[in-house]
């Protein structure tokens, strides 16, 4: 990871790193001794919530960490040394989504995974990938809203494309050839794009699952 001229190098569990980076697309993560590092040495103990939609990852106490704090349309990073760097939210979105995509591509190219028989481990595994896909899709949707670019999403084995034209946002399913229009998104985003945090949070909370 590079922050300004500072490069942080470490060996860690990149799948856990990618998920926690996806979490920080909409949430702050502040360094704390009782929380997992952003690049954990090991991050394989997965604790699922009750409805298997989110996961808390526990690892050993060695790794690399920093704070990620949202400030309007910017993101501020605070390193353990006290060094601070600021980037635009859009830049951060691109970097995080690209990293997560690379990790998932590598994972998918590996041998098929066996779902754990143990219920606790199985729930953790299922919740991990549910949260990953939800946060990845939602991140792409928000980026599409902000840039107007077409974004490709996947959900339950189907492929979707989110785009906008003439002030209307559309969701196209490649398999069913169905198109849905959501004109209300445009008006909501036009109010949120100038930094109104409350409205921006409303946009961020329009999840991919909500509209299907």
Residue ranges and their predicted role:
Residues 6-43, 130-152:
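Negatively charged, low-complexity tracts enriched in Asp/Glu with abundant Ser/Thr
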Residues 130-142, 170-171, 186-212:
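Cysteine-centric segments in proteins
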Residues 1, 12-15, 35-62, 145-174:
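Amphipathic, interaction-prone secondary-structure segments
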């Amino acid at each position: 990871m590079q922050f300004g001229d500072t490069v942080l190098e470490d060996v860690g569990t990149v799948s856990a790193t990618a998920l926690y980076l996806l979490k920080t697309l909409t949430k702050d993560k502040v360094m704390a001794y009782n929380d997992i590092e952003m690049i954990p040495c090991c991050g394989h103990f997965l604790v699922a919530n009750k409805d298997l939609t989110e996961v808390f990852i526990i690892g050993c106490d060695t790794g690399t960490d920093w704070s990620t704090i949202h400030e309007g349309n910017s993101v501020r990073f605070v390193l353990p040394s006290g060094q601070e760097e600021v980037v635009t939210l859009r830049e951060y979105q691109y970097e995080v989504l690209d990293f997560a995509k690379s990790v998932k591509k590598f994972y998918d190219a590996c041998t098929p995974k066996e779902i754990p028989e143990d219920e606790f481990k199985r729930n953790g595994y299922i919740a991990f990938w549910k949260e990953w896909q939800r946060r990845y899709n939602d991140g792409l949707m928000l980026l599409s809203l902000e840039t107007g670019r077409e974004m490709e999403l996947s959900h339950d084995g189907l492929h979707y494309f989110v785009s906008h034209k003439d002030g209307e946002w559309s969701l196209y399913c490649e398999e069913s050839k169905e198109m849905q229009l959501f004109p209300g998104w445009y008006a909501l985003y036009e109010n949120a794009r100038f930094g109104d945090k409350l409205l921006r949070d409303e946009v961020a909370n329009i999840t991919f699952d909500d509209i299907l």
